[in-house]
Amino acid sequence: MNQIKYKFYLKIILLSLLLVKASSAEILKPSKDVDPKKVVKIQLTALMKNDIPYKDRGIIQTWEFAHPNNQKATGPIERFINMIKTDSYAMLLNHTDHEIIETYMSKNVATFEVTVLDVSKKYYKFKWQVEKYNIEGALKDCWLTTAVSQPMPLGSSI
């Protein structure tokens, strides 16, 4: 009887672990409940763990919160993935730390100063802009990224 209970509990534990793993792989979708800073945080956290739990998941998550006009300019997704991997943005991939500071906020636009510490211990600063989408449809009133500046190198950490 104890062996049956043991197998039952083992199955429950394994199923729980699989569900946790599956939920961590889930791509978050834009929602009007996600505030502007949280949009940037979602994108940066995803890029910080780009290949977890699968290759380029962080870039795909970042794409999900890109404004449709931004997607038109940088897409399709395969092109966006390649763009993020260029020297201009590669420091965002698997970075070790980031800081997000709000520099401007209005009813429809928010701008943040983002500082990233990359894997080689160099700091970079970006201007990250999100806007509230105002066209009818599933994205109406969602905050979405409209622009990310080129990086400004700030030097190495000690």
What feature does the model see in each segment?
Residues 11-21:
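Bacterial N-terminal signal peptides
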Residues 53-107:
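Short solvent-exposed beta->alpha transition segments
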Residues 35-51, 61, 65:
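Short, aromatic-enriched amphipathic alpha-helices that serve as compact interaction elements
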Residues 2-12:
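Bacterial N-terminal signal peptides that target proteins for export
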Residues 30-32:
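TPR-adjacent "capping" and linker segments in tetratricopeptide-repeat scaffold/adaptor proteins
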Residues 103-158:
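Exposed beta-sheet edge and beta->alpha loop/turn motif
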Residues 22-27:
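Boundary at the C-terminal end of the N-terminal hydrophobic targeting segment
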